[in-house]
A protein has these predicted regions:
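Positively charged, low-complexity terminal tracts
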Residues: 1-95
Length: 95
């Protein structure tokens, strides 16, 4: 039985890679850029090189991921939940 993924990955008609999670969509110029994002999240660090997002802890102990381009905020219950999502994204984005 396959686990339902908490995101969808698709390609737009103009060639961008779209990742939708928690009802929010982020567009990446290439699948490689999306993979870079997923790998950075998997490592639980901000991707300073591309400036795609940063992570911050909330006062109630949760983890927020703030996307720099759109300002979208995705809240995870903890680092483990974020890491699990990232691992799933990496597997789906690898060629």
């Amino acid at each position: 039985m396959n686990e339902k993924k908490p995101y969808t990955i698709s390609e737009t008609s103009d060639g961008l890679t779209s990742i939708t999670m928690a009802g929010l969509t982020e567009l990446f110029k290439t699948r490689g850029t999306a993979l870079s994002f997923a790998l950075a999240l998997a490592d639980r660090v901000s991707d300073r090189r591309t400036g795609i997002f940063h992570l911050q802890d909330t006062p109630d102990g949760k983890l927020q991921m703030i996307m720099h381009k759109t300002g979208n905020v995705i809240t995870f219950k903890d680092y483990d939940q974020a890491a699990k999502l990232a691992d799933m994204l990496v597997k789906d984005l690898l060629p």
